[in-house]
Amino acid sequence: MAKMSMKNRELKRQLTVAKYAKKRAELKAIIVDLNASPEARWEATVALQKQPRDASAARMRNRCRITGRPHGVYRKFGLGRNKLREAAMRGDVPGLVKASW
């Protein structure tokens, strides 16, 4: 089990990303736009850099919904490999069967 502080930190990051998403998209559009003046592009770059680090979606980490484990998480299920295996063995995951050949 991951520490509660780590789970809460990740939750806080998700909220921060959602809060700044629209503004970040606008600033990135200005930076990429070649028709915008160099001054406007520079100001957008500086404004983007002044935003909190956690406003970037790249800093979010996928975690297991049950244990909070940061590694070995399957995106499709949102579960860590251990908990996914346990759920599959119980038959809780429809269509998922243990490989046998």
Swiss-Prot record:
A Gene Ontology molecular function term of the record: rRNA binding
Disulfide bonds: none
Residue runs in coiled coils: none
Keywords from the UniProt entry: Ribonucleoprotein, Ribosomal protein, RNA-binding, rRNA-binding
GO biological process terms, semicolon-separated: translation
Entry GO CC: cytoplasm; small ribosomal subunit
SUPFAM superfamilies: Glucocorticoid receptor-like (DNA-binding domain)
Protein role: Binds 16S rRNA, required for the assembly of 30S particles and may also be responsible for determining the conformation of the 16S rRNA at the A site.
Subunit structure and binding partners: Part of the 30S ribosomal subunit. Contacts proteins S3 and S10.
Family note: Belongs to the universal ribosomal protein uS14 family.
PANTHER family the record matches: 30S RIBOSOMAL PROTEIN S14, SMALL RIBOSOMAL SUBUNIT PROTEIN US14M
Protein name, entry field: Small ribosomal subunit protein uS14
Source organism: Pseudomonas syringae pv. syringae (strain B728a)
